[in-house]
Amino acid sequence: MKISIISDAHLGFSPVEKLEEDSYENFEEAFTKALDSDLIILAGDLFDSRAPKTKAWAYALKILSKATLQENRGVKLVEIDKQLKEASKKTLEHLPVIAIHGNHELRAKGEINAIEALENAGLLIYLNMNKVVFEKNGEKVAIFGLSHVPERFAKDVLDKWDPRPLEDCFNILLLHQNIDPFVYSPLEQPTLNISNLPRGFDLIVDGHIHVSTQEKIDNTIFIIPGSTVITQFQASEAQNPKGFFKIDTKLKKVEFVEINARKFFYETIEISREQNAREIIERKIREKIFGNFKKQPIVKIRITGNAMISEKDLRELERKYQDSCILFFTKSLESTELTQKLEFLRSLKESRVSLQEIGLNILKKSLDELNFKNSFDFVDIFNLLADEEVDTALNILLGQQKTLRMVK
């Protein structure tokens, strides 16, 4: 069976206006190139927000509907361990799409997330601690999917679920987590690592990490598709292409398919106080933008050393070259104290951790410092605060209320 695996499209991601279309165009290219497959797997973070804007929804519906226009290539559903929604049968009649949710789509327990909504529309089959088995020409493929959970719970949840490969199947385990040594978020250390992943699977797929990787763990193929759009603006993204994986399950052959993502340059320049900082930076910019580009390239320059260059100068450079490239600057100051204070915020910004995940961890840290007992789910408290139900959250914290419903 031929399967395409796409991850982290982050539809709706737009740090600046010029980059607004990139997430849509890149995902559409990847998905279109995957239409020659028997199955398509989406490994989380299809959207950039847990409450996607209308434009992101419009593109998701437009792009995913392409699978419903394809003829089924003889792929049949053999088994699924969840109640299959009537609408989901629509995707089985054409090119089946299987998906899990990522951390950017995580919602409170009991709420419908964006991936579930797409399942309700008949565009995909959503897995969360579920397995589904397909068959084509006598060959069976079993897909076990665990959607994203907070990192501190990942190992316990995976152990409790205890997915076990099926006999006479090509077995795939689908995750969206930090896995040591592939650490993504600076907020929480992973509880999963290469050595404690379930054994016996033919293929393990992990979303969440934005740089593509292919490894071998014993007899298991381990792949990280990476994101289809540049979001972190880190050196690793400049060094690795964007795209997705295709796998032939019969031959156990894996192929990385590159897409035409916007060119991204990352440069570190060390400048001393005696040098002309602006002149050196400008020379580097001109060097990078020399050439023919389909889209304006992104150029990120990290400035180190003790050179004196003002924010005003950097903003002027951004304006000067705005018709040639998209410029980002970051400065590593020599003041140790200030550098330490900025390091955490910079790592958050560059890692593209969702605002929800940042807020959840800050809330948990604060509650731990106040010695609150675990008599409530702090994720529910966070969502109440996010929905401006402050009184309900306070009543639960004080033990005056046990339910999440507003007391009247």
Language-model regions: role of each:
Residues 7-13, 338-339:
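Short polar catalytic/cofactor-binding loops
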Residues 1-4:
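Extreme N-terminal starter segment of soluble prokaryotic enzymes
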Residues 11-24:
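Acidic/histidine-rich helix-loop elements
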Residues 12-15, 153, 310:
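Short N-terminal binding/cap micro-motifs at the start of the first secondary-structure element
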Residues 22-35, 64:
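Divalent metal-dependent phosphoesterase catalytic cores across multiple superfamilies
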Residues 32-45:
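Active-site metal-binding motif and surrounding structural segment of the metallo-beta-lactamase
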Residues 251-408:
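Accessory, non-catalytic peripheral segments of nucleic-acid enzymes
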Residues 22, 39, 48-245:
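His/Asp/Glu-rich metal-coordinating catalytic cores
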